[in-house]
Amino acid sequence: MASFTNVATLSYGGNQVSSNVVTGEIREVLTVSKTAVPAAYAVGATITYVIYLINSGTAALTGLTVTDDLGGYAFGAGMVYPLRYTDGTVRYFANGALQAAPDVTAGPPLRFTGITVPAGGTAALVYQAEVTAYAPPTADGVISNTVTVTGGTLAGQTATEEITASQAARLEITKALSPAVVAENGQLTYTFTIRNFGPTAVDAADDAAVTDTFSPVLNDITVTYNGTPWAAPGDYTYSAATGVFSTTPGRITVPAAAYTQSTDGTWVITPGTATLVVSGTI
């Protein structure tokens, strides 16, 4: 809500006198808010945004344009954008009723045009955006993006929403077999590679564990973790009868990822890595 002041001046006979100061307020007819779900992001994740418009006036607000800057920030000589609109996801509501989808310019910036907010009513835009490689994945990473509503006599109301980089570990595991063709009674080796793409290390308190059922079962197995020999039952358990192999919860630890920003503005993630190797005869 903006306020204004005004003072009159009276001139007479070479003299000048000022009036009292009067103060008024300009009550904004349109209120704009913006929310994001979820509030934490990772590169490649989908964020749902909700733009909520409230018209407190007695006349409908028509022909509005809603512009989202997609979190763009200056990098080098240009701009980079940590968000990308997901085509076809917008839903437009007036007083809670679903309307035909507005015209969309994916941008950046992202624009929705032809929006109407009923008199004394509400409108909402719900849409999704993908987190791009320009989003900082670091522990202090933030995406701040602003929506601006223009049209008619509106001055350009804005609303800003911030989401923060997820602080959780993000693990992936891959499994490799060597050799792919093995002779009867030959030796097989399974290599499990565990990668952490998150900014937080996985330590013993996280109780991470790997479980597998080897078929065919392995006999006389040997196990190493990051090149260090492991022994049962402290580090793992294994049943040669069933082929069920399990590491002891907490023995799997994986360092945090490292992050660097490239010259083009994209972030490169170097995951923390751990390697579990199990060998035996069939």
Task: Set out the residue ranges of the language-model regions.
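Exported/extracytosolic protein signature
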Residues: 1-282
